[in-house]
Amino acid sequence: MLEDEFGREVSGVRVSLTDRCNFDCVYCHNEGLGDTRGPMDPQDDEMSTDDVVRFLEVVSQFDIGKVKFTGGEPMLRDDLTEIIRRTPSSMEVSMTTNGTFLPGRAGALREAGLERVNVSQDALDPDEFAEITKSGAYDRVLEGVEAAVDAGLAPVKLNMVVFEHTAEYVEDMVNHVSENAGLQLQLIEYMPELTGHPEWNIDIQRVHDWLADIADRVETREMHDRNRYFVGDGMVEIVDPVENPTFCANCHRVRVTHEGYLKGCLNRNDDLRSMGEMTREEIRETFRETVANRVPYYGEYLIKENDEWVLNDKYLDAPTTHS
């Protein structure tokens, strides 16, 4: 298994299959690339089926044991089932989706090798859900969650971004998963540095404190040193990467954009490495370089000076590698 100079082993990859999406969520940062949502028709710049599989076969040789397929909306890829079926058997396969295409397809994806899904569900109120996602697909998402559970993809993890628009629904969502053994809840801190609108931000520590008070028990997950709050039949965890050196120090993933760029850090786009028409050996070496050049964003790339996060001087002249 490869590790960077900070001792962080890379055990998983997060692969964006498309930047297309049938939602237009107000908080979306498109896997750290910003608001670059593409048109709905298939695009020539998306990695092909063979591109994705070749990359996964190469990195599996480094004991990469997990792959999460993301988007955009990955279920807009007509070849998604084939990609999952051809993923190396040594890898645990999961996917993040808005859930609208799961009805009628969840079973086939499970048979192809998909093991888990995260479904975006930011509110249990249809009107607020429509306002956040710019879609009227609330009922379809609920059907998708049910289809995933029925297909054996449980526990289904519901993703909820916590910000001004959704904060009042956190308690409802926690109660919802506490009453449904097939569901878990992942509360995701809003990232204004990637999406703008800092006025939408809330203090995520208040949510931690509230959950600690109501939880039946609290456990700490090794990855990201993250707390898990068990409430009734459900489990809730918080993803809070903003200004969080602990989160960065425990990051074990490399990302791949839909165009085939290796991306060592969610927050950075100055370290992209294109796989383009590379051979397998070239992909191996480029992946090695990407891992070797990873640095914790908070605590290394950015450092605290006078209570402000500033760019570490040693990275001021860092080369930009987009090709």
Curated annotation (Swiss-Prot):
InterPro entries, alphabetized: Aldolase_TIM, Elp3/MiaA/NifB-like_rSAM, MoaA_arc, MoaA_NifB_PqqE_Fe-S-bd_CS, MoaA_twitch, MoCo_biosynth_MoaA/MoaC, rSAM
SMART domains for the chain: Elp3
EC number, UniProt record: 4.1.99.22
Residues that coordinate or bind [4Fe-4S] cluster 2: 248, 251, 265
Protein residues bound to [4Fe-4S] cluster 1: 21, 25, 28
GO-annotated molecular function: 4 iron, 4 sulfur cluster binding; cyclic pyranopterin monophosphate synthase activity; GTP 3',8'-cyclase activity; GTP binding; metal ion binding; S-adenosyl-L-methionine binding
This protein's pathway: Cofactor biosynthesis; molybdopterin biosynthesis
One matching Pfam family: Mob_synth_C
Protein function: Catalyzes the cyclization of GTP to (8S)-3',8-cyclo-7,8-dihydroguanosine 5'-triphosphate.
Family classification: Belongs to the radical SAM superfamily. MoaA family.
Identification of the protein by name: Probable GTP 3',8-cyclase
